[in-house]
Design a protein with these regions (language model features):
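Bacterial N-terminal signal peptides that target proteins for export
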Residues: 1-11
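Bacterial N-terminal signal peptides
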Residues: 10-19
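Extracytosolic low-complexity repeat regions of secreted or lipid-anchored proteins
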Residues: 64-121
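C-terminal region of N-terminal signal peptides and the immediate post-cleavage residues
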Residues: 18-34
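Extracytoplasmic low-complexity, Pro/Thr/Ser/Ala/Gly-rich segments
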Residues: 29-66, 74-92
Length: 121
C-alpha cells in the first residue's frame, strides 16, 4: 500500500464523520431551559410570582403547573410535595415576620419547572 493511501484513508473517514455530525445534532431534542413570561404576577394564588423557567415542557404548561402548585398549598405557610404528576421541592429564604421568598422546583421525568415567589404572611 502506498504512503499516500495510508495517510488519506483516515482523513476520508474523519471528513465523512464531520459531514454527518451536524445532521445528527439537528435531530437531538432540545431540552434547554427557557425563561417564561409571568404575566400578572398576582394571578397565581400567592402574593407575587417573580420568575418561571421551563425545561422539557411549554411555558403555557409551566404557568398552569405553578397555579396548580399554589392551589395545592394549604395556606400561606403550607407546602405542596406533588402536583399534576410532578414532584416538587421548595427552599424558603429571606424570611421575616411579614414575608418570605421561595424557590420551587417541580420535576417529572425529563420535564422541570422552576419558579420563585414572594409570600406575605
Amino acid at each position: 500500500m502506498s504512503r499516500f493511501v495510508r495517510c488519506s484513508a483516515p482523513l476520508a473517514v474523519l471528513a465523512a464523520c464531520a459531514a454527518l455530525a451536524p445532521t445528527a445534532l439537528a435531530d437531538a431534542p432540545a431540552t434547554a431551559s427557557k425563561s417564561c413570561s409571568v404575566g400578572n404576577s398576582r394571578s397565581y394564588g400567592t402574593t407575587y410570582v417573580l420568575s418561571i423557567r421551563a425545561s422539557g415542557t411549554s411555558c403555557r404548561s409551566a404557568r398552569r403547573l405553578v397555579r396548580a402548585f399554589h392551589a395545592c398549598r394549604p395556606g400561606k405557610s403550607g407546602r405542596c410535595g406533588s402536583v399534576s404528576g410532578y414532584r416538587c421541592s421548595e427552599s424558603r429564604f429571606n424570611k421575616s415576620s411579614q414575608s418570605y421568598d421561595s424557590r420551587v422546583t417541580c420535576s417529572r421525568g425529563g420535564n422541570t419547572v422552576k419558579h420563585t415567589y414572594t409570600q406575605f404572611t
